[in-house]
């Protein structure tokens, strides 16, 4: 939308400029035409005045008066002489005296009498005009070319012309000679790494002799402790060891439950004293 508005405004501005230029050209052309018309009228008036002036001079020449006297009689001024008395004796061979001071300016002369009427002109001729008389103006032969006039003012700049047509393509020129080898240029920047190529074919197994064994490498660092091993199998029963020393007497156990009543005993023998139990030895 903004582009359309800007384009419309630009088109209106260009149209206004073109219209102003066209109006200026039209006005300038009208002024030149009016100037030519005025100069033509002035030339005609000048011709008429020259003819009239020549006629007046011819009339005065017929009366015995020169043209210079006639002009002075019209445009000149008759000075009045100062009233002086000429009663003295006239000079006889005396040298001329010094020039006197300029006299006072005279009074303006009065209006001269009107000139006499000119002679009556010849009566005009009544020339019949035939019907087949050409209505166009009579073309007089061209006079000698006049002097060059003053250079005119610089005209307005014309409107831009249309774009010229595209010319035909020219012929290919002859190949030029091989030029000299130029100076070595600066090394270019490193290119970008290329794309990965397709996988190559499988290589052939070499048939060379085995090489000499290399030197043993340095011992590597100590590894981490291994995991605990599985429990070993139960070993065979060993030989019986020597008899250990008798242990300490244990604590008396709890009384057992009373047993069942035994059968009735047989009649015992006559009463006798039971033998005493043996005395136990204390072990250290």
Swiss-Prot record:
Coiled coil: none
UniProt similarity note: Belongs to the cuticular collagen family.
Record's compositionally biased regions (Low complexity): 181-193, 224-246, 255-271
Biased composition (Basic and acidic residues): 163-177
Region ranges (Triple-helical region): 94-126, 143-270
Source taxon at top rank: Eukaryota
Organism this protein belongs to: Caenorhabditis elegans
Classification lineage: Eukaryota, Metazoa, Ecdysozoa, Nematoda, Chromadorea
Stored InterPro entries: Col_cuticle_N (IPR002486), Collagen (IPR008160)
Function: Nematode cuticles are composed largely of collagen-like proteins. The cuticle functions both as an exoskeleton and as a barrier to protect the worm from its environment.
Ranges annotated as biased composition (Gly residues): 106-115
Any single biological process term in GO: cuticle development involved in collagen and cuticulin-based cuticle molting cycle
Description of how the protein assembles with itself and partners: Collagen polypeptide chains are complexed within the cuticle by disulfide bonds and other types of covalent cross-links.
Region (Disordered): 88-284
UniProt-recorded name of the protein: Cuticle collagen dpy-5
Keyword tags: Collagen, Cuticle, Disulfide bond, Repeat
